Amino acid sequence: YKAPYGTKAMGALASAACASFLVEAFQDSFFGKVLGFQFLSEVGGANGSLSGVAAAILVTIAIGVTPGYAVLIGLSVSGTGIIPGFLAGYLVGFLVKWMERNIPGGLDLISIIIIGAPLTRLVAKLLTPLINSTLLTIGDILTSGAHSNPILMGIILGGTIVVVATAPLSSMALTAMLGLTGMPMAIGALSVFGSSFMNGVLFHKLKLGSRKDNIAFAVEPLTQADVTSANPIPIYVTNFVGGAACGILIALMKLVNDTPGTATPIAGFAVMFAYNPMIKVLITALGCIILSLLAGYFGGIVFK
């Protein structure tokens, strides 16, 4: 079974993550917490707090709702997370779309105000406890697993988070929703950092897109989600192997990262200096670069 407008909806979720969590990772985690710019920290916090609103608005636009109505129902989920906002916007969006088509002009606006906005918030509120408890439970399991078997956790987390980073999802959104901190978040941050180099080599070897596309994918994989969707096997397999290798190294180096949601190449690397000795971070990052370049090179040979 396929969800209606599934591809467009997932693209909207990725865009919402970029608009909220990516800005938060740069402005709040890096410029704010690491460099000490209070105003920029506020900018990041503002964007991050509206992830649910962004997801609800973008997904309703993606399924064909008029932008004005999409904003109307999207604003109603203010204060909720990205997944509850996304699901509420997606589900209620179809009703709003039907109301647009079948209710006379003028009355459709009143109907959406009276029915659509409250219903969207109600759905988001009902979903929030279930989603939060599920994700936090998973996050707790991963965090405790990092202490009992850090190498295995490095393989699982490093591989999985890097694959999610290249999918039409968001590693930032995933790690933020799971509430990962400590070693698991360090694995996520530096594994994704290493994947930039891996994917640059892989794209070049497989001749996927132009040089501009290669650079864009290396900086932020979500920008080239269409290329990933067209070539899933080589990209996902190579990224899992490279991410797992980086995860093992990071686990062995015992790095930590107490800023959730920083599984993004540049900000993820930068924020590591706030919680670990500089030399240790640089050595580990260099190791991740080498492992990732090797994974990208051999992945390009295998799948060429």
Which role does the model predict for each range below?
Residues Y1-K304:
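Pore-lining transmembrane helices
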